[in-house]
């Protein structure tokens, strides 16, 4: 029990250190990674029929994707920013549906979309 608590504290400190040292490009990478992790955890909770936990994790994933939407710069990003905004909006709608229908395939769909966006973002060097 104590080992798990210590591990969680270590992970939290590690995440905080990464965030405090990160440039804006890296922060977006961390957000996307966090979103993918929450989606995987939500899938596990859904499979284990842990309904409250599933709802919390999907809510966190929605919050992260909402944060990614807010970070878009439509003036500098132009058409790409608009396309990403619509994609993020779609992802959020699918997550709401996944939460109400307990459909893991919807979580998988959003995970695949977010992973594709993250792969593109990771390909940009900063």
Swiss-Prot record:
Gene (name only): fliS
Similarity comment text for this entry: Belongs to the FliS family.
Protein known as: Flagellar secretion chaperone FliSB
Lineage of source species: Bacteria, Pseudomonadati, Pseudomonadota, Gammaproteobacteria, Pseudomonadales
Taxonomic source organism: Pseudomonas aeruginosa (strain ATCC 15692 / DSM 22644 / CIP 104116 / JCM 14847 / LMG 12228 / 1C / PRS 101 / PAO1)
Keywords of the record: Bacterial flagellum biogenesis, Chaperone, Cytoplasm
Principal place of residence: cytoplasm
Gene Ontology CC: cytosol
Gene3D superfamilies found in the cross-reference section: Flagellar protein FliS
GO BP, sorted A to Z: bacterial-type flagellum assembly; bacterial-type flagellum-dependent cell motility
Pfam families xrefs: FliS
Localization, UniProt: Cytoplasm, Cytosol
InterPro entries: FliS, FliS_sf
